[in-house]
Amino acid sequence: MNTHPTPASQLAAAVDELHRAVTADRAGAAAAVELVSGAIADALRPYTPTVVVVRDNLDDGVLAHVVSRELDLPTVRIYEDSGLLSLSPPPDPGARVALLAASWHDMSALPALRLLLAHAQAEVVAVAAALPVTDAVLAAVDGTPVVTAAASSRTPR
């Protein structure tokens, strides 16, 4: 774990690189993924999650791997098959969830994911994203804290 703050310009460049990677439908440069994921992990620490939950796709999976590694937490994947959502492995009852995505551009999924986790007796303590979130996403999370790579101790305040 890097304990030295990352300059804001370097973090912004990494987020830009990750955004280009996501829009080009590829995982992106390893250095950008490491930097952005580390910043997300730093931003999540105050919420003390016990598990990272992520949709099963390449971009989100790569971020979840690094964030989970940085926080020393397990990862739970959300699978979708014929419109049905499932968790694998299921989180422990009472789990404190960091719900992670590279981008929450499709916020229509958020209520369904939160409901799925509530049925699993897990509490979403933070919604995390690599890319900046919109006001619509903020409204969809209904008061749950939202963290991004920009809100990190790796960025000078």
Give each language-model segment a name.
Residues 1-157:
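PRPP-associated nucleotide enzymes
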